[in-house]
Curated annotation (Swiss-Prot):
Residues 1-145 form the MGS-like domain. The lineage of its organism: Bacteria, Pseudomonadati, Pseudomonadota, Gammaproteobacteria, Thiotrichales. SUPFAM superfamilies: Cytidine deaminase-like (SSF53927), Methylglyoxal synthase-like (SSF52335). Signal peptide: none annotated. This is Bifunctional purine biosynthesis protein PurH. Coiled coil: none annotated. The keyword Hydrolase applies. GO terms for cellular component: cytosol. Belongs to the PurH family. Pathway: Purine metabolism; IMP biosynthesis via de novo pathway; 5-formamido-1-(5-phospho-D-ribosyl)imidazole-4-carboxamide from 5-amino-1-(5-phospho-D-ribosyl)imidazole-4-carboxamide (10-formyl THF route): step 1/1; Purine metabolism; IMP biosynthesis via de novo pathway; IMP from 5-formamido-1-(5-phospho-D-ribosyl)imidazole-4-carboxamide: step 1/1. InterPro entries: AICAR_Tfase_dup_dom_sf, Cytidine_deaminase-like, MGS-like_dom, MGS-like_dom_sf, PurH-like. NCBIfam families: PRK00881.1, purH. The IMP cyclohydrolase activity resides in the N-terminal region. One of its GO terms (molecular function) is IMP cyclohydrolase activity.
Length: 520
C-alpha cells in the first residue's frame, strides 16, 4: 500500500471538488486536470497541471479528445512492480487516483426539449474510459466517482500517511463499475427506442435498469427461498422503498410486498383513509372523519383476515388509533406519513410490530412495472389510470344517486388493487365485502357476499365494482339478489346490452368506466 502522489481530477459535478483538491494538495499530491475543472482549481490558486501540458498533446475537437492518451492510460493501467520498466521507457508516470464524474447524460435526455444532438454531446467517452482503467487497476489506483465519498477518502488518507487501504480501493472500484454500467445502460435505453427513419418506440430493444440492494433477508416468499430487497438508486416518491422504520423486526419479503400494496391503495384517496392488506389483497378499506374512524371501519370489514395484516394510513397515526390497533389485533406492519410521539409510545409496547413512516404521500409517479416469467421479463407502464365522475358513462335507465356515485368511485379505486377477478362491495365509504383472485367473476361476487355475511354486515344498499366487464348477465342477477343497487365496471363485452338489460330489470344503476384494471 503506497501513498497517493498523483491524482487526475476531471468532474462535471463540481460540488465539493475545490475543498477536496485543496486537501489533496496539502498532502503533497500532484494534481492533473482538464477543461472546466482545471479552470476552477487554477483560479482558486491551487497548483495544477493541465492534461494537455502533461501529455504534450492538445485538447481537440471541442473537447471530445482530452484524456485519451498513453501517458494517461498507461499511468492508470500500469502495474506497479510489473510494468515499471515499460513506463520508464516511455516516460509514463503512475497516476494513483482518478476523480471523475460523467457528463450528465440521464439529466440531459430527461429534459422534454432534448434533441438528439444534445444527447450525443452528453455521452462521455474519456470519463468512463479513465474510470474503467483505474477500476481495473484498483490494486494500485483509487477511483473516485461520487462527491459523497470525498470526506471518507480524505479522512482515511490523513490518518494513514496519504494511503488508502485495499478494501477502500476495492469498494470504490465496485462502485465505479456499477456507475459505468448504469451510464451505458441509460445510453443504450435512450438510443434503443429510436429508428433510423425518425420513428420512436416506447420500449428499447434491449432494456437495461439497475437497482441497489437495500436489505438482505432471512428468506423469501417461503423459508426455502433466498431473497434480498433492492430499490431504485434515488427513489423520490413516498413508498415502501423510501420509508423509515421506527421500530420492530426487520421487514420480511412478504411484509414489503404487502406494505407496498397497502400504501399504494391508500395514496389514491384524498379523504382520510385506512387500508388493511393480507396477502397483497385489501381485506378492509374505509374513509372516515378522522384516522380512528377510518381504521375502525376498515377493520370491521373483515376482522378475521385483518389478523396478522398490514395497515396503511394516508394521515398521521395518532394515539387513539394506535391504542385501538394494539388492543384489537395482531399486526405485522403499520405505515403512515407520520406518527405522533404518543402513538409511538403506544406501539412501543409491542416491540415486534414494524412501525414505518413514509413522509408526505404526494402523487404517484409514472414508472415501469415488471413481471418475471421463465426466461423473460414483462415490462409495462405502471397502472395509474383513473376516471373522474364526468368520464363515467351511465348506461342504465336509472342514474346513480349522489351517494351511490360517491360509493361507486370509492369501490372502483379499491377494485384496481384487488387481484383479478375482483369484486368489491361498498357502502357509505367502507368496504362491505371483497372477492379476490377467483377464476370466475360470479364466484368472486359470491365470496364478497359471504365475507359480508360472516361479519354481520348488510349488503342491501351497497354498490359493486368489478375490475373487468361482466361477460354474462348472471353477475348482475346475483348482485340484485344480494341487494346491490349500483354497479361500476369497464364495459366492453359483446353482451354489454344483455348486462345492461339485466340491470334495468332489477332497477340497478350502472356506469361504465371504459378502463379495465386486471391485476395478476
Amino acid at each position: 500500500m503506497k501513498p497517493v502522489r498523483r491524482a487526475l481530477i476531471s468532474v462535471s459535478d463540481k460540488n465539493g471538488i475545490l475543498e477536496f483538491a485543496k486537501s489533496l494538495t496539502a498532502m503533497d499530491v500532484v494534481i492533473l486536470s482538464t477543461g472546466g475543472t482545471y479552470k476552477v482549481l487554477s483560479e482558486a490558486g491551487l497548483p495544477v497541471t493541465e492534461v494537455s501540458e502533461y501529455t504534450g498533446f492538445p485538447e481537440m475537437m471541442d473537447g471530445r479528445v482530452k484524456t485519451l492518451h498513453p501517458k494517461i492510460h498507461g499511468g492508470l493501467l500500469g502495474r506497479r512492480g510489473t510494468d515499471d520498466a515499460v513506463m520508464a521507457e516511455h516516460g509514463i508516470d503512475p497516476i494513483d487516483m482518478v476523480v471523475v464524474n460523467l457528463y450528465p447524460f440521464e439529466a440531459t435526455v430527461a429534459k422534454p426539449d432534448c434533441s438528439l444532438e444534445d444527447a450525443i454531446e452528453n455521452i462521455d467517452i474519456g470519463g468512463p474510459t479513465m474510470l474503467r482503467s483505474a477500476a481495473k487497476n484498483h490494486k494500485d489506483v483509487a477511483v473516485v466517482t461520487d462527491p459523497h465519498d470525498y470526506a471518507r477518502i480524505l479522512e482515511e488518507m490523513e490518518s494513514n500517511d496519504g494511503q488508502l487501504s485495499h478494501a477502500t480501493r476495492f469498494d470504490l472500484a465496485i462502485k465505479t463499475f456499477e456507475q459505468t454500467a448504469r451510464y451505458d445502460g441509460a445510453i443504450s435505453n435512450y438510443f434503443g427506442t429510436m429508428f433510423s427513419d425518425d420513428k420512436d418506440d416506447t420500449f428499447p430493444r434491449t432494456y437495461n435498469t439497475q437497482f441497489v440492494k437495500k436489505q438482505s433477508m432471512r428468506y423469501g416468499e417461503n423459508p426455502h427461498q433466498s431473497a434480498a430487497f433492492y430499490t431504485e438508486r434515488n427513489p423520490t416518491e413516498a413508498s415502501i422503498s423510501t420509508a423509515k422504520q421506527l421500530q420492530g423486526k426487520a421487514l420480511s419479503f412478504n411484509n414489503i410486498a404487502d406494505t407496498d400494496a397497502a400504501l399504494e391503495l391508500v395514496k389514491t384517496f384524498e379523504e382520510t383513509a385506512c387500508v388493511i392488506v393480507k396477502h397483497a389483497n385489501p381485506c378492509g378499506v374505509s374513509i372516515g372523519e378522522n384516522v380512528f374512524e377510518s381504521y375502525d371501519r376498515a377493520y370491521k370489514t373483515d376482522p378475521t383476515s385483518a389478523f396478522g395484516g398490514i395497515i396503511a394510513f394516508n394521515r398521521a397515526l395518532d394515539q387513539e388509533t394506535a391504542q385501538a390497533i394494539i388492543d384489537r389485533q395482531f399486526v405485522e406492519v403499520i405505515i403512515a406519513p407520520n406518527v405522533s410521539e404518543d402513538a409511538k409510545n403506544v406501539i412501543a409496547a409491542k416491540q415486534n410490530v414494524r412501525l414505518l413512516v413514509c413522509g408526505d404521500l404526494g402523487i404517484q409517479e409514472p414508472a415501469y412495472d415488471y413481471k418475471r416469467v421463465t426466461g423473460g421479463l414483462l415490462v409495462q407502464d405502471r397502472d395509474l389510470g383513473s376516471v373522474t365522475e364526468d368520464e363515467l358513462k351511465v348506461v342504465t335507465k336509472r342514474a346513480p344517486s349522489e351517494k351511490e356515485m360517491a360509493d361507486l368511485q370509492f369501490a372502483w379505486k379499491v377494485a384496481k388493487y384487488v387481484k383479478s377477478n375482483a369484486i368489491v362491495y361498498v357502502k357509505d365509504g367502507m368496504t362491505i365485502g371483497v372477492g379476490a383472485g377467483q377464476m370466475s367473476r360470479v364466484y368472486s361476487a359470491k365470496i364478497a357476499g359471504i365475507k359480508a355475511a360472516d361479519e354481520g354486515l348488510e349488503v342491501p344498499g351497497s354498490v359493486m365494482a368489478s375490475d373487468a366487464f361482466f361477460p354474462f348477465r348472471d353477475g348482475i342477477d346475483a348482485a340484485a339478489e344480494a341487494g346491490i343497487t349500483a354497479v361500476i365496471h369497464p364495459g366492453g363485452s359483446m353482451r354489454d346490452q344483455e348486462v345492461i338489460d339485466a340491470a334495468d330489470e332489477h332497477g340497478i344503476a350502472m356506469v361504465f368506466t371504459g378502463m379495465r384494471h386486471f391485476k395478476h
